[in-house]
């Protein structure tokens, strides 16, 4: 294993040109979950092929590195690369804004063509995936003179629905993309390195990173960089599993053609991508939950993943008990956040409570729609609703302060309760 950490250098292959080259990017906290992706990749690999696997990370610890290296068979190479120095030395005023669920590592995939120019093709995979087939087949797909191969994002088929007008507007006006239905997911990207114009690519990175209203930062940037330069393939190669696509309403809303494509990819997907905050390690209701744990049991991180699962279930039960007990009180209540937690809670307990005035959500595409029998309102409607109590159902530790400030600014006098 050649340790590339903290060296601002171009990465060179360790095998010949026929090797399968794969990059993952994550922080140390995600190492245990990545081990499941790695195990699934190993179990479905070809013993006659070589696999050059490189981890992009800025904070991975020695303990995690040692545990991951224990998993590696003879035909695999596992190396670790910190791109921080390269980025700082190459770019000035580069805006790499992080969000609640996403660390700076989410951006590192963007720099693959720049630091891996000695490769012909490189596959990037997110770490919250399970490889469910031999990945060699993906490398055999021709680029057809395109710079990357990717899969259409799960939400793209429903973008034409009236409720998603704001999402379409973001893709067209903010990102400047001509065809929103070609918007791809960044969790699986096969780069055609030899075809990418590095100078032009570098300029576009600088320009696109300055957009201040990116919803999915790395993914939005990559869609700008590779507009009209991407070959879209079957979503079997990046099947997005989450509460949305498991919901029967999703299937009833999308068109017949898109529904057929979706159901076909759902049947024995080649790569399973757990794309929402609801993951197999924090919820038993996630689609392909059993597949994830089949591989997790084989990793040296199994006990740690199991502990995370147990703690998540305890935390979830505590939130449910707290929310349930608050709803029993004779007070006018508004729920803040049309979150997956709230949807699951209302369904699970079949909640029908006249004290619930409605749900507040900042996403304007949800305004006017219903969860169960409860209408979703915008924050501007809160004063008119005039609740005694506002319960935050979005599981974010820093969310209470912003809501409290909103209440002060709008002279709203209600008790604010957080479930975190």
Label every model-predicted segment.
Residues 59-60, 85-86, 134, 360-366:
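Short, polar loop motifs at secondary-structure junctions
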Residues 129-162:
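Conserved donor-nucleotide/metal-binding helix-loop-beta segment in metal-dependent transferases, i.e.
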Residues 306-420:
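Hydrophobic, well-ordered beta-alpha structural blocks that scaffold small-molecule cofactor pockets
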Residues 72-114:
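Active-site-proximal specificity loops/subdomain of glycosyltransferases
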Residues 40-49:
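Short, acidic, metal-binding catalytic loop of nucleotide-sugar glycosyltransferases
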Residues 1-20, 26, 186, 191-323:
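A glycosyltransferase accessory/donor-loop signature
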Residues 122:
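Short aromatic/hydrophobic "clamp" motif used to bind/position activated sugar donors
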Residues 52-59, 150-152, 357-362:
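Short internal beta-strands
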């Amino acid at each position: 294993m050649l340790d590339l950490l903290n060296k601002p250098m171009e990465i060179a292959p360790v095998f010949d040109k026929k090797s399968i080259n794969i990059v993952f990017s994550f922080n140390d906290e995600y190492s245990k979950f990545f081990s499941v992706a790695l195990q699934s990749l190993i179990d479905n690999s070809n013993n006659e092929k070589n696999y050059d696997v490189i981890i992009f990370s800025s904070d991975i610890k020695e303990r995690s590195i040692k545990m991951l290296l224990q998993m590696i068979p003879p035909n695999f190479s596992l190396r670790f690369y910190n791109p921080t120095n390269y980025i700082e030395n190459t770019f000035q005023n580069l805006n790499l804004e992080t969000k609640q669920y996403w660390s700076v590592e989410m951006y590192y995939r963007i720099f693959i063509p720049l630091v891996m120019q000695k490769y012909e093709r490189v596959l990037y995979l997110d770490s919250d995936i399970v490889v469910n087939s031999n990945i060699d087949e993906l490398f055999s797909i021709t680029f057809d003179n395109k710079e990357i191969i990717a899969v259409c994002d799960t939400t793209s088929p429903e973008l034409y629905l009236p409720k998603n007008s704001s999402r379409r507007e973001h893709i067209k006006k903010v990102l400047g993309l001509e065809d929103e239905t070609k918007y791809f997911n960044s969790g699986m990207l096969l780069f055609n390195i030899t075809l990418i114009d590095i100078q032009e690519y570098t300029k576009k990175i600088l320009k696109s990173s300055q957009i201040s209203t990116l919803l999915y930062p790395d993914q939005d940037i990559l869609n700008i960089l590779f507009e009209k330069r991407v070959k879209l393939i079957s979503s079997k190669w990046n099947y997005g599993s989450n509460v949305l696509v498991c919901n029967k309403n999703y299937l009833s809303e999308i068109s017949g053609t898109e529904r057929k494509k979706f159901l076909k990819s759902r049947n024995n997907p080649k790569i399973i991508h757990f794309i929402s905050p609801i993951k197999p390690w924090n919820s038993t209701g996630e689609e392909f939950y059993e597949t994830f744990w089949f591989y997790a049991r084989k990793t040296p991180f199994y006990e740690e993943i199991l502990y995370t699962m147990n703690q998540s279930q305890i935390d979830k039960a505590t939130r449910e008990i707290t929310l349930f007990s608050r709803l029993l009180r004779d007070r006018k209540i508004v729920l803040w956040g049309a979150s997956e937690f709230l949807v699951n809670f209302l369904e699970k307990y079949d909640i029908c409570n006249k004290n619930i005035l409605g749900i507040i959500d900042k996403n304007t595409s949800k305004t006017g729609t219903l969860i169960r029998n409860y209408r979703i309102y915008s924050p501007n409607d809160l004063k008119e609703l005039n609740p005694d109590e506002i319960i935050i159902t979005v599981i974010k530790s820093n969310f209470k302060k912003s809501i409290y400030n909103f209440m002060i600014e709008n002279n709203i006098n209600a008790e604010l309760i957080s479930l975190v």
